[in-house]
């Protein structure tokens, strides 16, 4: 689940669950393989692949596993021929939800995604219904580093913005195309991100309360459990007090 920094603790807790971990790795490998098949097998020349590799590394996937996935994609052959489709919809309290999928069967995928929305009190929208509320950006998150030094290094590397959150974590934003360059520059300067991804950042938020927040979480869980779903983005905002009860 990708959303906003307020979800970081929930996202990382979910990622640590053994039941989820295997599925997360499967999704990462599919993204790496597809990115290598559709573009250059060298991450330095393929921004989408570079982002997929970065996400896999911060998720503790081994280099060997990553390289095998790249080789499988670059080799073409008779493997899965997947296409990327993004579905848009509405969750509880008018929250905007985008669902990024990799699929070999559009009909199956849209039926499963629509069912999840309907089951959780939301509804699947049309193309463009919520996409305008999001911007695609590279996002690098750092903890326990010197703020001034990181800011200097990030801006030198070509980052768009650097934001310090209330919990002390620091988020570095980039354009999707500059993501790899900024990541390489920061790592060369000695800064290793806690997480690194190209994600969708909402421009507005939908405030959720103790009643609607669990419904959005249920929708996200149902969507993420679908094999064809790679990422779920949303603009739901939940207070720390409500988040602690989820």
Swiss-Prot record:
It comes from the Bacteria. It is found in: Cytoplasm. GO terms for cellular component: cytosol. InterPro entries: Integrase-like_N, TACO1_YebC-like_2nd/3rd_dom, TACO1_YebC_N, Transcrip_reg_TACO1-like, Transcrip_reg_TACO1-like_dom3, YebC-like. GO terms for molecular function: DNA binding. Keywords: Cytoplasm, DNA-binding, Transcription, Transcription regulation. One of its GO terms (biological process) is regulation of DNA-templated transcription. PANTHER family: TRANSCRIPTIONAL REGULATORY PROTEIN YEBC-RELATED (PTHR12532:SF6), TRANSLATIONAL ACTIVATOR OF CYTOCHROME C OXIDASE 1 (PTHR12532). NCBIfam families: PRK00110.1 (NF001030), PRK12378.1 (NF009044), YebC/PmpR family DNA-binding transcriptional regulator (TIGR01033). Belongs to the TACO1 family. This is Probable transcriptional regulatory protein AHA_1522. It comes from Aeromonas hydrophila subsp. hydrophila (strain ATCC 7966 / DSM 30187 / BCRC 13018 / CCUG 14551 / JCM 1027 / KCTC 2358 / NCIMB 9240 / NCTC 8049).
């Amino acid at each position: 689940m990708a959303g906003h920094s307020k979800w970081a603790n929930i996202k990382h807790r979910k990622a640590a669950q053994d039941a989820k971990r295997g599925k997360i790795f499967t999704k990462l490998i599919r993204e790496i393989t597809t990115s290598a098949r559709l573009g250059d097998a060298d991450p330095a020349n393929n921004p989408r692949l570079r982002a997929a590799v970065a996400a896999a590394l911060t998720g503790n996937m081994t280099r060997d596993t990553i390289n095998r996935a790249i080789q499988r994609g670059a080799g073409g052959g008779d493997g899965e021929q997947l296409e990327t489709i993004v579905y848009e919809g509405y969750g509880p309290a008018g929250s905007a939800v985008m669902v990024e999928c990799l699929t070999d069967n559009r009909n199956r995928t849209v039926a499963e995604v629509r069912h999840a929305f309907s089951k959780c009190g939301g509804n699947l929208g049309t193309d463009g219904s919520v996409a305008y509320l999001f911007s695609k950006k590279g996002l690098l998150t750092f903890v326990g580093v010197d703020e001034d030094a990181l800011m200097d290094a990030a801006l030198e590397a070509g980052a768009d913005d650097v934001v310090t959150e209330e919990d002390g974590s620091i988020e570095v934003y980039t354009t999707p195309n500059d993501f790899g360059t900024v990541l390489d520059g920061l790592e060369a300067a000695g800064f290793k991100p806690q997480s690194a991804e190209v994600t969708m950042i909402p421009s507005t938020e939908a405030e959720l309360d103790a009643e609607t927040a669990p419904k959005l979480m249920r929708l996200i869980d149902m969507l993420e459990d679908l094999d064809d779903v790679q990422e779920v983005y949303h603009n739901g905002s939940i207070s720390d007090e409500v988040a602690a009860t989820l």
